[in-house]
């Protein structure tokens, strides 16, 4: 029986989940929910189903894998990764995965703040990258070395 991934009909938070499902060659179906046009942004397609799925915390994205029902994008990613032994075997490897997961979240949040800003534009991005708030690393620096990796 295929897993079921539910999310809005956009890339958003579910896109990393889709990529991991594809990478792991996981059999899954997708349920996409539409949002109506402005100014109402009708969400009734999702709201009509939201409380019928048996989710502990009804939200999007969600993943249903048999009796396992998950929400929250990072919890879903970790669940899939654990199923496919992608979370490391040693404590050191698991720590690295934890750190990288949180670093990716920080980068994603910083980019979202820029992209969803009402003042979004190249001047704004350029100013941010020249400011003291912009941190190029540690992932993008030569110092970001994991032992002998």
Segment roles from a protein language model:
Residues 1-4, 131-149:
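C-terminal helix/juxtamembrane-tail motif
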Residues 1-126:
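GST-like domain detector, emphasizing the conserved glutathione-binding G-site
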């Amino acid at each position: 029986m295929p897993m079921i991934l539910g999310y809005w009909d956009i890339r958003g938070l579910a896109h990393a989940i889709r990529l991991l499902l594809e990478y792991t060659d996981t059999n899954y179906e997708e349920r996409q929910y539409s949002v109506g046009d402005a100014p109402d942004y009708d969400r009734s397609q999702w709201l009509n189903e939201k409380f019928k799925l048996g989710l502990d915390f009804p939200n999007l994205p969600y993943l249903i894998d048999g009796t396992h029902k998950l929400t929250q994008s990072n919890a879903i990613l970790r669940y899939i990764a654990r199923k496919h032994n992608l979370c490391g075997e040693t404590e050191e490897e698991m720590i690295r995965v934890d750190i990288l997961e949180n670093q990716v979240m920080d980068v994603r949040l910083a980019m979202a703040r820029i992209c969803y800003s009402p003042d979004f534009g190249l001047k704004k991005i350029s100013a941010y990258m020249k400011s003291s708030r912009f941190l190029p690393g540690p992932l993008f620096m030569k110092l970001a070395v994991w032992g002998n990796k």
